[in-house]
């Protein structure tokens, strides 16, 4: 029985994780749930799952949740950075699902890794912002890091077991691997007239053809920044060189990624586009459990298609790949700028095509600095956010 803490419990990954847990009640126990400010959602989860702890990042939300919990509920409500650190490092916490979207998830995820926990990594920003430091800390603490992102989980499943055991430090070439093929659907605007992209609305950007995701990740999919961040993640997870990574547009989202070997073989991981599959894989690794997902029906799929990414259509993807080449400072700045830009787009303050413009201008402002600690990274993140806000003010 694994005691699990879910960071981002009220989001889509949190919901999928709880669904897998309900399917496998003898194997997993909900020990702690963490959310930002969604009181009603957290209240319902506490009543249903009866966790020992419910942590709200927002202090007022924590007070409201505490007042609403029925007397029979055993859950203890906490708030504050110290309480969150105590929860993820608690000796009774076995596994941490890191699913808080954005830079907000970096510190608790890093704390869990530092404590040597089994960390199921759904938070892209942990590696985008602190990849080298993150993987070094995991190695030093003995933490187990398993990738939840469907693409990285697919790559992981296609790798030899000895490579799986050396994430962050594996030698792909020595194991006969020539390329990692990172697939992406191309999002809702894959075939949209380029001249009309500036008029696309948040609702249109969030209408993904295959996946059910939160608003921020949906917009990132529409710009393909999502794939760019995954490109950076893959660099750190699988210790790749830029020439070993390729992005492939695959609109059907059936092949979640592939590994190409020196002998000409290509191993692909396939399945219906449902996050419960990679979540269940990580939760039970190296075993397999039921995820509640319908098996892939090849007769219904019919055909699979592929194409190269168009960087005129997806400039954010190019920016992310360039930032990956520049180093950790650039990827940290790009991530921060993108979060501010996407939030502004979702609030109707900038156009869809302005997202790439904001990202480019912020990335262009990167100054070389050493990032030796989480504090250094968070300071640069804060500076980049301020720069993004300033850039956006010139667009209005």
From Swiss-Prot:
InterPro entries: DXP_reductoisomerase, DXP_reductoisomerase_C, DXP_reductoisomerase_N, DXPR_C, DXPR_C_sf, NAD(P)-bd_dom_sf. 1-deoxy-D-xylulose 5-phosphate binds at residues 124, 150-151, 185, 208, 221, 226-227, 230. Its cofactor is Mg(2+); Mn(2+). Mn(2+) binds at residues 149, 151, 230. NADPH binds at residues 10-13, 123, 125, 214. Pathway: Isoprenoid biosynthesis; isopentenyl diphosphate biosynthesis via DXP pathway; isopentenyl diphosphate from 1-deoxy-D-xylulose 5-phosphate: step 1/6. It holds the Pfam family DXP_redisom_C. It catalyses: 2-C-methyl-D-erythritol 4-phosphate + NADP(+) = 1-deoxy-D-xylulose 5-phosphate + NADPH + H(+). It comes from the Bacteria. One of its GO terms (biological process) is isopentenyl diphosphate biosynthetic process, methylerythritol 4-phosphate pathway involved in terpenoid biosynthetic process. Its EC number is 1.1.1.267. Keywords: Isoprene biosynthesis, Manganese, Metal-binding, NADP, Oxidoreductase. One of its GO terms (molecular function) is NADPH binding. The keyword Thylakoid does not apply. Belongs to the DXR family. Catalyzes the NADPH-dependent rearrangement and reduction of 1-deoxy-D-xylulose-5-phosphate (DXP) to 2-C-methyl-D-erythritol 4-phosphate (MEP). NCBIfam families: Dxr (TIGR00243), PRK05447.1-1 (NF003938), PRK12464.1 (NF009114). PANTHER family: 1-DEOXY-D-XYLULOSE 5-PHOSPHATE REDUCTOISOMERASE (PTHR30525), 1-DEOXY-D-XYLULOSE 5-PHOSPHATE REDUCTOISOMERASE, CHLOROPLASTIC (PTHR30525:SF0). This is 1-deoxy-D-xylulose 5-phosphate reductoisomerase. The lineage of its organism: Bacteria, Pseudomonadati, Pseudomonadota, Gammaproteobacteria, Alteromonadales.
